[in-house]
UniProtKB/Swiss-Prot annotation:
Keywords: Apoptosis, Chromatin regulator, Cytoplasm, Dioxygenase, Iron, Metal-binding, Nucleus, Oxidoreductase, Transcription, Transcription regulation
Name of the molecule in the record: Bifunctional arginine demethylase and lysyl-hydroxylase JMJD6
Disruption phenotype: Viable and fertile with no obvious morphological defects. Loss of interommatidial cells and increased levels of ommatidial fusion due to increased levels of apoptosis during the pupal phase of eye development. No effect on apoptotic cell engulfment by phagocytic hemocytes (macrophages). Adults possess disrupted circadian rhythms with increased levels of night time sleep.
An annotated Gene Ontology molecular function: histone H4R3 demethylase activity
Disulfide pattern: none
Species in which this protein is naturally found: Drosophila melanogaster (Fruit fly)
Residues noted as binding 2-oxoglutarate in the record, renumbered to the chain: N202, T290
Gene name as annotated: JMJD6
Length: 408
């Protein structure tokens, strides 16, 4: 019997509606669980974590910049959550009670608009689902809602990541940058690079996340799942770990593109430098907060990509920087936009998994729309980008526009 039939009637009805809108291509009775990953998920735990850990209390900001941020080196940070109210408040039971009738984004429809679900229904779905790649909350608008914004009181930005240069664009114009993310085992984020050269941090409050990270020079064709391999689930994290990951463990896989692997536990924060490919699979029920950022350290790359990908936004940004941060405006003026940044982009103009390497052409490398996101660290999915591109080509506008504010 499908897990949907185990849900209360109203939850079952709402879950079906959300699924129909978010993934209309999965239209068969058993399409959501055709691969039966729920029954064969145990082997996905079998890997070796190989990423360095540091303690926030033992590494000052200046040392973090020199050891990790400036050389674009991933790391796991412990101790960032000390004193966070989220440790106590962010449980399934408490979230289902406090935010029971609040709607959170868990997908997008074919027009690129948000598909939302009430928290009470989503928690019931989480606790019963046997879907191969379940619905996943990835809400960037929670901070704009008078009730959901209370989540902001439950955490603080870790000390290494408080340099927030996109704030000078204005809260209504800046690209989406923070997400409340929550999902069951087998949900997750397909392989991607975060937008506009931004770096990201992801702090896990509950559960475990499995990460694979690859340096920016890794050719896209090595990492992307083809239609032949993944079918209708080609963009899903569990599909990537089933099809591409085994190849990364073969002797024939290029040594310079070996993955960094992480099992992130509750209380740990993963730092993802700009330009790094990464894929994330939830191993059990997870709740996390993640933010993308531009700092003084990564500003040259972020500025370069923003000018190329979001020219109107860059002009507004530069006007404010000239007034409030003239030293950064001077850096912006000195950057040669005709030179490559050396960092790849998960380009919306070339989303085919069989396409050429992301570093093979300057035009592809620098194409990045920086739109709304639905992942663990801020990059928009290829599926969402294609939907949005179709809508814009047809003259659509409104809440799905790419003006930097999130859809709600």
């Amino acid at each position: 019997m499908s897990e949907e039939f185990k849900l209360p009637k109203r939850s079952r009805k709402r879950t079906r509606e959300v699924k129909r809108k978010a993934r209309p291509e999965l239209d068969g009775e058993n399409a959501w669980s055709a691969m039966r990953y729920c029954e064969k998920f145990e082997p996905f735990w079998d890997f070796t974590d190989n990423l360095e850990r540091i303690e926030e209390s033992q590494v000052p900001e200046s040392e973090f910049i020199e050891r990790f941020e400036r050389p674009y080196k991933p790391v796991v940070i412990r101790g960032c959550t000390d004193g966070w109210l989220a440790l106590e408040k962010w449980t399934l039971a408490r979230l289902a009670k406090k935010y029971r009738n609040q709607k959170f984004k868990c997908g997008e429809d074919n027009e690129g608009y948000s598909v939302k679900m009430k928290m009470k229904y989503y928690v019931e779905y989480m606790q019963s689902t046997r879907d191969d790649s379940p619905l996943y909350i990835f809400d960037s608008s929670f901070g704009e809602h008078h009730r959901r914004r209370k989540l902001l009181d439950d955490y603080v930005v870790p000390k290494y990541f408080r340099d927030d240069l996109f704030q000078y664009c204005g809260e209504n114009r800046r690209p989406p940058y923070r997400w409340f993310v929550m999902g069951p085992a087998r949900s997750g984020t397909g392989i991607h690079i975060d937008p506009l050269g931004t770096s990201a941090w992801n702090t896990l409050i509950r559960g475990h996340k499995r990460w694979c990270l690859f340096p920016t020079q890794t050719p896209k064709e090595l990492l992307k799942v083809t239609s032949a391999m993944g079918g209708k689930q080609r963009d899903e994290a569990i599909t990537w770990f089933s099809t591409i990951y085994p190849r990364t463990q073969l002797p024939s896989w290029p040594e310079q593109y070996r993955p960094i692997e992480v099992l992130q536990g509750a209380g740990e924060t993963v730092f993802v430098p700009g330009g790094w490919w990464h894929v994330v699979l939830n191993m059990d029920d997870t709740i996390a907060i993640t933010q993308n950022f531009s700092s003084q350290t990564n500003f040259p790359c972020v500025w370069h990509k923003t000018v190329r990908g979001r020219p109107k936004l860059s002009r507004k940004w530069l006007r404010v920087l000239r007034d409030q941060r003239p030293e950064l405006a001077q850096i912006a003026d000195s950057i040669n936009l005709n030179e490559s940044t050396g960092f790849a982009s998960d380009s919306s103009s070339n989303s085919s998994s069989s396409s050429s390497s992301s570093s093979s052409s300057s035009e592809e490398e620098e194409s990045d729309d920086g739109g709304d996101s639905n992942t663990d660290s801020g990059q928009e999915s290829l599926t969402a980008k294609k939907k949005k591109k179709r809508r814009m080509a047809g003259g659509g506008s409104g809440s799905g526009s790419m003006g930097g504010s999130s859809r709600s």
